[in-house]
Amino acid sequence: MSNLNTLLEQAITIPEPNASDVGQLFMLHHGVGIDAQAMVSVGEHLAKIFPQAHIVSIQAPHACDMGRGAQWFSVQGVTEENRGERVSAQMPLFLSAIEAWQRKTGIGPEATALVGFSQGAIMSLESTQQQKSVAARVVSLSGRFVALPHVPELGTTLHMIHGKKDPVIHYGFCVKAAEHLVEEGADLTADVLPDLSHEINSEVLELMTKRLKEHIPAEVWRKAQAEALSSTPKG
């Protein structure tokens, strides 16, 4: 519980919205070796586009073992074989923080979006592989799944943005996961930017907001189609 309390205390709200107007919750998750402050510019950009959103940047719970910043799990000695164990060990706390902010704001999973960069994106993506989804949308910036994923719970939309020049997490992980998920019928967008490294720049911010604003989730289409069919005169 102390770790959860610390996460809640160290989170940065950007900005503090009018409580009567709040209709969405964005939760931002930074990469390894940096902190919640590093995602403030992302939150400020989102606040301009979504003025009725509650936007909070979460500080990872552990001091980074590489000398500065914070982390969800250590990347020292991380391999394809042990990455999943490290993510799984931190997932209960990650989910608890999301649920705590949902209770605090009165906003449910259907109006929650997770935006993660690097390790924060890994945790955000992997949250969709749990038994119950905690967010309707997940934005992965320079992230990856631990392994080939299954389709998230119905209603969850993924937006994956990656740089072809990323030296930290190869863009191939994004492409492979996206191709697999499309084949399985998942709702997602995936963009690989040819000149992008392991970073969040203005091009990424503009593309992210474009996807969030303009992509109509498949679940919305399904409901609209069902309503149209039910109202069609018989005979």
What would you call each of these model-derived segments?
Residues 110-155:
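Primarily recognizes the serine-hydrolase "nucleophile elbow" in alpha/beta-hydrolase
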Residues 59-63, 144, 196:
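Short beta-to-alpha linker loops that shape the active-site pocket of alpha/beta-hydrolase fold enzymes
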Residues 23, 110, 153-158, 184:
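Short, proline-enriched alpha-helix->beta-strand connector loops that line the catalytic pocket
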Residues 172-235:
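C-terminal catalytic histidine-bearing segment of alpha/beta-hydrolase fold enzymes
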Residues 160-162, 166:
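Short beta-strand/loop motif that positions the catalytic acidic residue
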Residues 30-32, 112-117, 163:
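Conserved alpha/beta-hydrolase "nucleophile elbow" surrounding the catalytic nucleophile
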Residues 3-107:
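Serine-hydrolase catalytic machinery in alpha/beta-hydrolase-like enzymes
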